[in-house]
Amino acid sequence: MPHSSDSSDSSFSRSPPPGKQDSSDDVRRVQRREKNRIAAQKSRQRQTQKADTLHLESEDLEKQNAALRKEIKQLTEELKYFTSVLNSHEPLCSVLAASTPSPPEVVYSAHAFHQPHVSSPRFQP
């Protein structure tokens, strides 16, 4: 029996007395809260940084989208212009009148050395 009391005495010596237990728990709790506060602050900073990055990316994409819409509008106008030029040229063109219907690539390649009947500033050197 004395042996068992020694072991129980040694177990009491391993854990701090009740007053010290409370203060060490308090210290751990304060440390854990501080660590958690810092982790939460870092998480909020990362979230803010991510939102800022997404906002800048969104603005950049909006600018690209506006530029592409402007280019589409310009190309559509150019297409209308060239379609109009082609339509006004077809009745005057002897190459088109003499040829049989063929794919557009062939018709346009026949025009490679043909002088355009266009007096537009676009075609002026």
UniProtKB/Swiss-Prot annotation:
Residue list for modification Phosphothreonine: T48
Main location (coarse class): nucleus
Tissues expressing this chain: Expressed at highest levels in lung, and at lower levels in placenta, liver, kidney, spleen, and peripheral blood. Detected in SW480 colorectal cancer cell line and several hematopoietic tumor cell lines, including Raji Burkitt's lymphoma. Strongly expressed in mature B- and T-lymphocytes. Also expressed in moderate levels in lymph node and appendix and at low levels in thymus and bone marrow.
Protein name (Swiss-Prot/TrEMBL): Basic leucine zipper transcriptional factor ATF-like
Family: Belongs to the bZIP family.
Region named Basic motif: 28-50
CDD domains: bZIP_BATF
Induction info: Up-regulated by PDCD1 following infection by HIV-1 virus, leading to inhibit T-cell functions and exhaust T-cells. Up-regulated by Epstein-Barr virus (EBV) protein EBNA2 following infection by EBV.
Task of the protein: AP-1 family transcription factor that controls the differentiation of lineage-specific cells in the immune system: specifically mediates the differentiation of T-helper 17 cells (Th17), follicular T-helper cells (TfH), CD8(+) dendritic cells and class-switch recombination (CSR) in B-cells. Acts via the formation of a heterodimer with JUNB that recognizes and binds DNA sequence 5'-TGA[CG]TCA-3'.
Subunit structure: Heterodimer; mainly heterodimerizes with JUNB. The BATF-JUNB heterodimer interacts with IRF4 and IRF8. Interacts (via bZIP domain) with IRF4 and IRF8; the interaction is direct. Also forms heterodimers with JUN and JUND. Also interacts with IFI35.
Residue ranges occupied by any bZIP domain in the UniProt entry: 26-89
Pfam families associated with the record: bZIP_1 (PF00170)
GO biological processes: defense response to protozoan; DNA damage response; DNA damage response, signal transduction by p53 class mediator; hematopoietic stem cell differentiation; integrated stress response signaling; isotype switching; lymphoid progenitor cell differentiation; myeloid dendritic cell differentiation
GO cellular component labels: chromatin; cytoplasm; nucleoplasm; nucleus; RNA polymerase II transcription regulator complex
